[in-house]
Amino acid sequence: MESLYRVPFTVLECPNLKLKKPSWLHMPSAMTVYAMVVVSYFLITGGIIYDVIVEPPSVGSMTDEHGHQRPVAFLAYRVNGQYIMEGLASSFLFTMGGLGFIILDRSNAPNIPKLNRFLLLFIGFVCVLLSFFMARVFMRMKLPGYLMG
């Protein structure tokens, strides 16, 4: 395999370039990278690619028994379709659950006082449990009868 890689370089000669990093380009801090990862996670789980391609409405409407139009946030009985608000709401829940796990991990640091550790554990558990149960509620609204019994 090595000889196969060597074949083009018998004819081609690599240029002797002395490249250096621009002085204005600095390595981003860990918090900046983390913020970019969380924002991209929020956008991807919210279905931003689907929203750009399909261009769904932000909310839908449903006619009630009196003939009035009522706004609805969830596109019921359609697994492969969504309104924009539905995607953003579920994306917020997924991100909140992920942040809850990160908060739970941060509560394990050895130099955290007992009260702060308790508060971090409480906030982390609340975020994880709230996002889990609200995602189940969203699934019941999206697919009525799916998670029953």
UniProtKB/Swiss-Prot annotation:
- Extracellular face of the membrane: 54-83, 139-149
Where does this protein chiefly localize? Answer: membrane
Protein name as annotated: Oligosaccharyltransferase complex subunit ostc
Native species: Xenopus tropicalis
Task: List all topological domains (Cytoplasmic).
Answer: 1-32, 105-117
Transmembrane residue ranges: 33-53, 84-104, 118-138
Biological process (GO), any one = protein glycosylation
Subunit relationships: Specific component of the STT3A-containing form of the oligosaccharyltransferase (OST) complex.
**What gene is this protein translated from?**
ostc
Q: Would you say which domain of life the source belongs to? A: Eukaryota
